[in-house]
Each structure stands twice: as C-alpha cells, then as structure tokens.
UniProtKB/Swiss-Prot annotation:
Protein name: Photosystem I reaction center subunit IX
Highest taxon of source: Eukaryota
Keyword Plastid: yes
Membrane-spanning residues: 7-27
Record's bilayer topology term: Single-pass membrane protein
Main location: plastid
One GO process term, biological-process aspect: photosynthesis
Job of this protein: May help in the organization of the PsaE and PsaF subunits.
Cellular component aspect of the GO annotation: chloroplast thylakoid membrane; photosystem I
Annotated source species: Pinus thunbergii
InterPro entries: PSI_PsaJ, PSI_PsaJ_sf
Thylakoid is among the record's keywords: yes
Protein keywords: Chloroplast, Membrane, Photosynthesis, Photosystem I, Plastid, Thylakoid, Transmembrane, Transmembrane helix
Family membership noted in the UniProt record: Belongs to the PsaJ family.
Amino acid sequence: MQDLKTYLSTAPVLAILCVSFLAALLIEINRFFPDALFLSLSFS
C-alpha cells in the first residue's frame, strides 16, 4: 500500500490525473454549452 501511495504521488502521475480531470471538465461544459467558445460568453 505504501508503494502505491508513493507511485500515485509522483509528478507524472499527478500531471496526467490533473490533465484528465481538466479535459473531462471541458468536455462536460462543452456538452451543456455547445456554442460557447468561452465560459464568460455562455452566461451573457
């Protein structure tokens, strides 16, 4: 279990998780606001 925690706390794994989360967030925003290029334009 300690090895798994050490592996998950390394920088490349954290970077991949962060990028994947941001990509999923952008995809979901694009699904609900398909015509909005920017977030500020979707609420005006």
